[in-house]
Amino acid sequence: MTKFIFVTGGVVSSLGKGIAAASIAAILESRGLNVTMLKLDPYINVDPGTMSPFQHGEVFVTDDGAETDLDLGHYERFIDSTMTRRNSFSTGQVYENVIAKERRGDYLGGTVQVIPHITDEIKRRIHEGAAGYDVAIVEIGGTVGDIESLPFLEAIRQMRSQLGRNNTLFAHLSYVPYIAAAGEIKTKPTQHTVKEMLSIGLQPDILICRMDRKMPADERRKIALFCNVEERAIVGSYDVDSIYECPEMLHDQGIDNIITEQLQLNVQQADLTAWKKIVHAVKNPKHTVKIAMVGKYVDLTESYKSLIEALKHAGIHTETDVQITFVDSESIEKNKGDVSVLKDMDAILVPGGFGSRGVEGKIAAVRYARENNVPYLGICLGMQIALIEYARDVAGLKGANSTEFDLKCAAPVVALIDEWQTADGSVETRDESADLGGTMRLGAQEVELKAGSLAVKIYGSGHIRERHRHRYEVNNNYVSALEQAGLVIGGVSAGRERLVETIELPNHPWFFACQFHPEFTSNPRKGHPLFTAFVKAALNNKKA
C-alpha cells in the first residue's frame, strides 16, 4: 500500500515547499524506497502553459508533454522518478473534469458540490498519481488559510481519516522570522498557521521551520509546546549556499527517522554519499566562467529555473563555478544594438521565450557571438534567433524573420507549421486562430543527428530524445539556401516532417543551437552532455 506525505505551507508563499518536499523524497529514495511526487495547484487555470513567466515563473514540461509548475523540475532533479501529467493538477483541471462528468450525466441528476464531488476528484487524482509507489509526497500549493486551497486541504483531511495515521503524514512548512531590531526569533506566526490548520481538521506531524539561521533549543521547545508537535519533529530549514545541501540538512535532524517510524517503513539507513559529493563539488570549484544569458524575463530569473540549474550541474561535472550574468535583450535593442556588456563574457546563451519584444537585441547578441568566435548556445527561440541572424547576415535573405514577429515578412525562415506527427504516430493540426493553451509541440520527441556533426560529438549518439515546447518551426523551404551558405543542420525530427532540431557552424569554435529544451532532463547527479560541452567550450575560450 502506498504511504502518503502531505506537504503544506503557512504564513507566506515562496518558502521553498518544493525544495523541502524534494529533499525528503531524496532522503527516502536513498533508503531504498520507490518514491514519487505530486504537485496540486489551487489556481483555476487548467495549466500554467498560457501564464506569463512574470506571474508564474518557469513552465516545466514533462516527458509526456504536460505543462506544469516549476516544482516538478525540482522533483526530477532530486529523485530518479520521471514526472508525468499525473504528477501535477490544478483546480481548473479538477473542475473541468467534474463539469464534464455532470454534462455526461455521470452524477444521475444529483446536485454537484465541492464536497463530495470536487474532493472525491482530488482524491482520485492523488491515488492515480501515486499508484505503484512505496511513498507519494504530495505538495499542496498556496498557503494554508487561502480560500483557493480549502478543497485540497479537505481532501487530504479525508484521506487521513480513511487511510489512518500509519499511512499518512502531514509536514507543514512555516516561516519563523528573526526581528533584527528586537534581536529575537518570533514563533507567533508559526503558532497561528498551526491554529489555522487545526481549524480545518489538520494536525501537523512534522513542522519544518523556514529560517535564516539555526533554531535555538528554547524556540524549538516553545513551538513544540504551543503547536502540539513532538520536539524532535520541529525541524529547521535554514539558509544554505546550495539547495543541494537540503537533503543532508534535513537528514541530520532526523526527519527521515520520524517519517519511517510513523509510516511503519522498515528500510535501510540513508546513504547520502552522492549528495555529499555534489555539495563538495559546488563548494570547491577549480575554475570560473562567465556566461551571459540574454533574454527578456531577466527581472524574474525563476523564469529560467531549469536552465540555471542545468548550468550549475555542468559546473559540478567540470569543477567550475558558472557565473551567470543576466542581460536584458530589450536594453540592447534600446541602445541600438550595443553589445558591450558581452565583451567580458566567456560564452553567450539565448534561452527560449515567446513574442517579439527584445528579439532584435537577441539577434545582436547572436551576431556578436558568431563574428567574435564566442561559444554560443541557443535553446528553442535561441535557435530560431540564430537562424534568422544567419539568414540575414550570411545567407543574404533580405527580410528574413519569423512569422511570430512579422506575419508578412519577405523571407519567413521560421513559421507556424499547420500539421505534424506526434510521437505516438497520430497527426495534429493548428493554425493562427488556434487556442494558445495546449497547442504547442510538447514533450519528448525523437531526434536524428547527422554523422560527423558537433551534435553527435556532444551526445555520443546518432539518435536522441529531448523535450519540446514550441509553436513555431524552421521553415524547410529555406533549409537548402541556408545549407548552401554554410549552416549545418545537425539534427532533424524523426517523423516524416524532418523538422530542424539542431544547427551549428563548422568554422566556429563552438556554435550550437537546438529547438528542444535539454535543461528539463538535467540533474546534479548526471548533468547533461550539452551543458557540460557548453561550459567546457566556455573554459576553452577563457584559456584562449
Curated annotation (Swiss-Prot):
L-glutamine binds at G353, L381, G382, M383, Q384, E404, R471. The active site is at C380 (nucleophile), H517, E519. It catalyses: UTP + L-glutamine + ATP + H2O = CTP + L-glutamate + ADP + phosphate + 2 H(+); L-glutamine + H2O = L-glutamate + NH4(+); UTP + NH4(+) + ATP = CTP + ADP + phosphate + 2 H(+). GO terms for molecular function: ATP binding; CTP synthase activity; glutaminase activity; identical protein binding; metal ion binding. It comes from the Bacteria. Residues 290-544 form the Glutamine amidotransferase type-1 domain. GO terms for biological process: 'de novo' CTP biosynthetic process; pyrimidine nucleobase biosynthetic process. UTP binds at S13, K186, T187, K188, P189, T190, Q191, K222. CTP binds at S13, D146, I147, E148, K186, T187, K188, P189, T190, Q191, K222. Mg(2+) binds at D71, E139. Pathway: Pyrimidine metabolism; CTP biosynthesis via de novo pathway; CTP from UDP: step 2/2. Allosterically activated by GTP, when glutamine is the substrate; GTP has no effect on the reaction when ammonia is the substrate. The allosteric effector GTP functions by stabilizing the protein conformation that binds the tetrahedral intermediate(s) formed during glutamine hydrolysis. Inhibited by the product CTP, via allosteric rather than competitive inhibition. It is an enzyme of class 6 (ligase). GO terms for cellular component: cytosol. Keywords: ATP-binding, Glutamine amidotransferase, Ligase, Magnesium, Metal-binding, Nucleotide-binding, Pyrimidine biosynthesis. Disulfide bonds: none annotated. ATP binds at S14, L15, G16, K17, G18, I19, D71. Catalyzes the ATP-dependent amination of UTP to CTP with either L-glutamine or ammonia as the source of nitrogen. Regulates intracellular CTP levels through interactions with the four ribonucleotide triphosphates. CTPSs have evolved a hybrid strategy for distinguishing between UTP and CTP. The overlapping regions of the product feedback inhibitory and substrate sites recognize a common feature in both compounds, the triphosphate moiety. To differentiate isosteric substrate and product pyrimidine rings, an additional pocket far from the expected kinase/ligase catalytic site, specifically recognizes the cytosine and ribose portions of the product inhibitor. Homotetramer. Belongs to the CTP synthase family. This is CTP synthase. It comes from Neisseria gonorrhoeae (strain NCCP11945). The lineage of its organism: Bacteria, Pseudomonadati, Pseudomonadota, Betaproteobacteria, Neisseriales.
